[in-house]
Amino acid sequence: MFLVLEYKEFGDLGQALAKERLFGEELARIYISEVLLALEYLHSKNVMYRDLKPDNIMLDGTGHIRLIDFGLSKLNVDSDNYSSGSFLGSHAYLAPEILASKSYGKSVDWYNLGVLLYEFLVGQPPYYKNDLEELYQNI
């Protein structure tokens, strides 16, 4: 058995943000537009991504993005009101309904898209705190 992976020499958006601190509006618009198209495609195939963050978005040699790490994705989500009570995701990117242990659906991906846009323009997630309890309260 062989595992073939695409090499992305330009790294991920987490690395790019660490280097640049934030993106200009034009670059943020391009990246967000491509992530939006990727999410639309996933949702059309009934996939809820659930772990959208800069570290899970790779850059290719032409400046376009690729989503990676589908480990937290949920298949066969055919409704925006899918009942999933799983507590999954990265702390600074968790949607309020996940923290409240409520059922959630594909809408958590759209929440994460907003968090991502904020981070691209400001340089950190909107409710970021080093203390986990404070972070959760802010969300």
Predicted regions mapped to residue ranges:
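Conserved short submotifs of the Hanks-type protein kinase catalytic core
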Residues: 1-12
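AlphaC helix of the protein kinase catalytic domain
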Residues: 14-23
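Activation segment signature within eukaryotic-like protein kinase domains
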Residues: 31-32
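Catalytic-loop of the protein kinase fold
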Residues: 43-59
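Conserved activation segment of eukaryotic-like protein kinases, specifically the C-terminal portion
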Residues: 84-94
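Conserved catalytic-loop aspartate of Hanks-type protein kinases
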Residues: 109
